[in-house]
UniProtKB/Swiss-Prot annotation:
Species in which this protein is naturally found: Drosophila melanogaster (Fruit fly)
Active site per database record: 203
Mutagenesis / variant outcome for changing residue 138 to F: Rescues lethality in Ints11 knocked-out larvae. Mutant adult flies have a shortened lifespan and locomotor defects
Cofactor(s) this protein cannot do without: Zn(2+)
Family: Belongs to the metallo-beta-lactamase superfamily. RNA-metabolizing metallo-beta-lactamase-like family. INTS11 subfamily.
Binding site for Zn(2+) 2: 72-73, 178, 414
Entry protein name: Integrator complex subunit 11
Outcome, altering residue 203 to Q: Abolished RNA endonuclease activity
Length: 597
């Protein structure tokens, strides 16, 4: 049986640094190439030495697929292509290709220009890397080479996020990246057809979570923000540039308008303009409501939300600030946090998942003091709230996706080991599917049955259609088509018997077996035949006994014929013949006639 092999170089029983090596049918595909936001050393990048100990990896990888623009899925891409060395094709959607280089450049500035880190990619490397990108369109099959085919499906999550169906020969895998099975205020729900892959590789960030109702969550969020600013406090909402930021901005904008509130709301400078540009450019990726109203009213032209200037950090009075990045691991959001954390009137609301090692993860874990690299210690007196507006599938959504695409095996990545184990047992109970959860560096081998795709002849399909119309089958059971497999000129065709024999130039021959029984009867042959037919009908109740034009009697393929005995006119010869398929019937009828005679 052919094998599918998967080795996580990142996101194996872990969140962050998503990077999987998929091998099947002699092809090696890299799925995502992210960086870990919780590390500032070599651990931030996937360990590419698993592919080749040193040197370029081009000859070992057939293609790279990037699911979306979040840095934990694409942050190591320039490092991999320009420093490690990869010149092959990189596939991603059009929005991902447009947005990823901006986020990569922002990250590079923070790491190199502010923190002074070395062994990092340059601006030119980002540009050179993006030249290797081949953009893909949703639901469009793309041939990487003669054997490797990929297709992108809508994943929700963020603008341009896609799940990928990957096929080599008869084997297929679906890689979800990050996805959301619930529509929100600006994006639709993830969707995939019933593709029945050999393996579904699914994220499992919220493997044990069933989210409360969206309306309750939004009401709680608005209540906490309003209460904090009403008493003069400041609210920090760390977000990533595109995605939850737009979702929460729309929510607050609508609430401020309805309640006629005047407290200032700020968004990190430049990001609102960028968001507007990309949502206009890729409007087809948003949900139906935004697509319908965009011409008349741009949902992202905010009346109450203004660009933020760093000088506002020390301004007195209440305010709400959206700042990047979303995990408080660097940038403006971390600067604001350091200033506002010691004040108990202030609040930070974490709307998404924070990986281990980030400041966001530490304060969500209850840390009252946070120590930084320069030995600066910040006391955390401000209120810390976690409200999941994360655009990841919860446990219910993951189960729904499994039901939708009907995989033969499931693999969980991008999650915590304990939560994965719980979900694995749920999948086993509900779907009886083998579920894998390899750790980083661990190769998982999945055997798949041999499947050979064949063409079917038109005449065979027409015959099956007639049979289907005559007696529709049970829709829950797969319909089998029977025919003759003809292999000719590197083509395999399933045909009916007549066409198959004609195709390969063979005349059909039928072998018949004949036995003779003597019977005392001096009357005419036709009368003997009629009397014999009546006797056989009595003896063979349930069988169809017919008289042929040539005077012979037919029972299935068995033929009974009466002839004169040339030597004795008072006797008749009864000849019984049958094909090898009906040997049992022929032997039974022969026995009946022998007893009669």
């Amino acid at each position: 049986m052919p094998d599918i092999k998967i080795t996580p170089l990142g996101a194996g029983q872990d969140v962050g640094r998503s990077c999987l090596l998929l091998s099947m049918g002699g092809k090696n595909i890299m799925l995502d190439c992210g960086m870990h936001m919780g590390y500032n050393d070599e651990r931030r990048f996937p360990d590419f030495s698993y592919i080749v100990p040193e040197g370029p990896i081009t000859s070992h990888i057939d293609c790279v697929i990037i699911s979306h623009f979040h840095l934990d899925h694409c942050g190591a891409l320039p490092y991999m292509s320009e420093i490690v060395g990869y010149t092959g094709p990189i596939y991603m959607t059009h929005p991902t290709k447009a947005i990823a280089p901006i986020l990569l450049e922002d990250m590079r500035k923070v790491a190199v220009e502010r923190k002074g880190e070395s062994n990092f990619f340059t601006t030119q490397m980002i540009k050179d890397c993006m030249k290797k990108v081949i953009p893909v369109t949703l639901h469009q099959s793309m041939m990487v080479d003669t054997d490797l085919e990929i297709k992108a499906y809508y994943a929700g999550h963020v603008l341009g996020a896609a799940m990928f169906w990957i096929k080599v020969g008869s084997q297929s895998v679906v890689y979800t990246g990050d996805y959301n099975m619930t529509p929100d205020r600006h994006l639709g729900a993830a969707w995939i057809d019933k593709c029945r892959p050999d393996l579904l590789i699914s994220e499992s960030t919220y493997a044990t979570t069933i989210r409360d109702s969206k309306r309750c969550r939004e009401r709680d969020f608005l209540k906490k923000v309003h209460e904090c600013v009403a008493k003069g406090g400041k609210v920090l909402i760390p977000v990533f540039a595109l995605g939850r930021a737009q979702e929460l901005c729309i929510l607050l904008e609508t609430y401020w308008e309805r309640m006629n509130l005047k407290y200032p709301i700020y968004f990190a400078l430049g990001l609102t303009e960028k968001a507007n540009t990309y949502y206009k450019m890729f409007i087809t990726w948003t949900n139906q409501k935004i697509r319908k109203t965009f011409v008349h009213r741009n949902m992202f032209d905010f009346k109450h939300i203004k660009p933020f200037d760093k000088a506002y950090i020390d301004n007195p009075g209440a305010m709400v600030v959206f700042a990047t990045p979303g995990m408080l691991h660097a940038g403006l959001s971390l600067q604001i946090f350091k200033k506002w954390a010691p004040n108990e009137n202030n609040m930070v609301i974490m709307p998404g998942y924070c990986v281990q090692g980030t400041v966001g993860n530490k304060i969500l874990g209850g840390a009252k003091k946070v120590e930084f690299e320069n030995r600066q210690v910040v006391e955390v007196k401000m209120a810390v709230e976690y409200m999941s507006f994360s655009a990841h599938a919860d446990a219910k959504g993951i189960m729904q996706l499994i039901q939708n695409c009907e995989p033969k095996n499931v693999m969980l990545v991008h999650g915590e080991a304990g939560k994965m184990k719980f979900l694995r047992s749920k999948i086993k109970d509900e779907f009886n599917l083998e579920t894998y959860m390899p750790a980083n560096g661990e190769t998982c081998v999945i055997s798949t049955p041999v499947k050979i795709p064949v063409d079917a002849s038109v005449s065979l399909l027409k015959a099956e259609a007639r049979s289907y119309n005559a007696q529709p089958p049970d829709p829950k059971r797969r319909r089998l088509i029977h025919g003759v497999l003809v292999m000719k000129d590197n083509r395999i065709m399933l045909q009916n018997l007549t066409d198959a024999l004609k195709e390969i130039g063979i005349n059909r021959h039928v072998m018949r077996f004949t036995s003779k029984v003597k019977m005392d009867d001096s009357g005419p042959v036709i009368r003997t035949s009629e009397r014999l037919k009546t006797l056989l009908e009595e003896k063979l109740a349930g069988w169809t006994v017919t008289m042929q034009e040539n005077g012979s009697i037919a029972i299935e393929s068995v033929e009974v014929k009466v002839e004169e005995d040339e030597k004795d006119p008072k006797q008749k010869n009864i000849l019984i013949s049958w094909t090898n398929q009906d040997e049992d019937i022929g032997a039974y009828i022969l026995n009946v006639l022998q007893n009669m005679c």
